Every structure is written in C-alpha cells, then in structure tokens.
C-alpha cells in the first residue's frame, strides 16, 4: 500500500442537496484525511480548464455549464491507496450502475449530475491538485 493524495470535488448537485458533511464523513470513515479544502464558484474558464481533456467531447459544454451552476467543494484527500479508495467510495460514474451504499448511488441522480469527481490516476491527482491548490494550502496531517 502507498500513501497517496487525490483530488475530490463535491459537485453543485450534491452541494445544493446539503450533503457535504455526509460525503466528507464517508471519506473520513474510510481512513482518508482531508488535507486541503475550499468551497468555490467556478468560472467557465476555470471549469473549462479543469476539464480541458474533454474539450472535443460532445458533453463538454454541458459539463462546464453544470460545474458552474453553483458552488463546489474541492478537497485533497490523503491516505493509503487514496485514489482507488476514493473511486470505490464514489461508485460508478452512472449512478444507476453504482453499487448500493456508494456516494453516487445515494446522492446522484444522473450520469451528468453525479455528485462527485475524483482523480483517476496518480498523474491526474498531481495535476488536479495543483490546478486548485498552491503547495502551501495543502497541510501535513501528522496527528
């Protein structure tokens, strides 16, 4: 097992349902520590830049529109195999295919409004964390 960091975003649909605390509790109960967090209202430029890898995909415009429709909570999670653990907690991208008890099965309504985002690899995690946080904003959690 390896100590990792991963980026997690609680998306506008979950923020508007007021389930931020419930989602964070799931991360912590699974052994993940929040080492950076903030609520932000993304601009079109910020959302478009974050999801730039999808720019040529047909859903890109709708994704940017959704991600700017309300505030999001962006956090860095740290723990043993944090990337895989977070993705397991999130569940399948399509909440209809997500296992019962996962974040998306419990809080998402559609593949478009699917409650959370999580990094899919160490390279993505490093890039995504740097997109939202300066190194000085990520705290060491020794205790």
Curated annotation (Swiss-Prot):
Bilayer-crossing regions: none
Q: What reaction does this catalyse? A: a 2'-deoxyribonucleoside 5'-diphosphate + ATP = a 2'-deoxyribonucleoside 5'-triphosphate + ADP; a ribonucleoside 5'-diphosphate + ATP = a ribonucleoside 5'-triphosphate + ADP
The consequence of residue 80 to K is:
Decrease in autophosphorylation. Strong decrease in alginate production
- Active site (catalytic residues): 117 (pros-phosphohistidine intermediate)
Listed under GO cellular component are:
cytoplasm
Would I find Cytoplasm among this entry's keywords?
yes
- Which SMART domains does UniProt cross-reference here? NDK
For binding ATP, which residues are annotated in this chain's numbering? 11, 59, 87, 93, 104, 114
Coiled-coil stretches, from where to where?
none
The EC designation for this entry is 2.7.4.6
For this UniProt record, the keywords arranged alphabetically read as follows:
ATP-binding, Cytoplasm, Kinase, Magnesium, Metal-binding, Nucleotide metabolism, Nucleotide-binding, Phosphoprotein, Transferase
Among its keywords, does the record have Nucleotide-binding?
yes
Molecular function GO labels: ATP binding; metal ion binding; nucleoside diphosphate kinase activity
Q: What is known about its processing and modification?
A: An intracellular protease cleaves Ndk to a truncated 12-kDa form that undergoes autophosphorylation almost as efficiency as Ndk does.
Q: Which cofactor does it need?
A: Mg(2+)
**According to the UniProt record, what happens if one changes residue 21 to V?**
Lack of autophosphorylation and of kinase activity. Cleaved to 12-kDa form, but cannot form a complex with pyruvate kinase. Strong decrease in alginate production
Q: Name one GO biological process term.
A: UTP biosynthetic process
Where found? Cytoplasm
- Note the InterPro entries from the entry: NDK-like_dom (IPR034907), NDK-like_dom_sf (IPR036850), Nucleoside_diP_kinase (IPR001564), Nucleoside_diP_kinase_AS (IPR023005)
Q: What is the effect of changing residue 56 to D?
A: No change in autophosphorylation. Strong decrease in alginate production
Q: How does it assemble?
A: Homotetramer. The 12-kDa form interacts with pyruvate kinase.
Among HAMAP family, the record links this protein to: NDP_kinase
Function of this protein? Major role in the synthesis of nucleoside triphosphates other than ATP. The ATP gamma phosphate is transferred to the NDP beta phosphate via a ping-pong mechanism, using a phosphorylated active-site intermediate. The 12-kDa membrane-associated form synthesizes GTP in preference to other nucleoside triphosphates. Important for alginate synthesis.
Instruction: Name the protein family.
Output: Belongs to the NDK family.
Q: What is this protein called?
A: Nucleoside diphosphate kinase
């Amino acid at each position: 097992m390896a100590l990792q960091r991963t980026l997690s975003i609680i998306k506008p649909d979950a923020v508007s349902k007021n389930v931020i605390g419930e989602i964070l509790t799931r991360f912590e109960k699974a052994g993940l520590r929040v080492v950076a967090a903030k609520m932000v209202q993304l601009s079109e430029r910020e959302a478009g830049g974050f999801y730039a890898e999808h720019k040529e995909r047909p859903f890109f415009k709708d994704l940017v529109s959704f991600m700017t429709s309300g505030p999001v909570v962006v956090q860095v999670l740290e723990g043993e195999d944090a990337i895989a653990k977070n993705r397991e907690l999130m569940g399948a991208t399509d909440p209809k295919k997500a296992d019962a008890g996962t974040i998306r099965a419990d809080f998402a309504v559609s593949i478009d409004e699917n409650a959370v985002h999580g990094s899919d690899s160490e390279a993505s995690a490093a890039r995504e964390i740097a997109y939202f946080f300066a190194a000085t904003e990520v705290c060491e959690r020794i205790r």
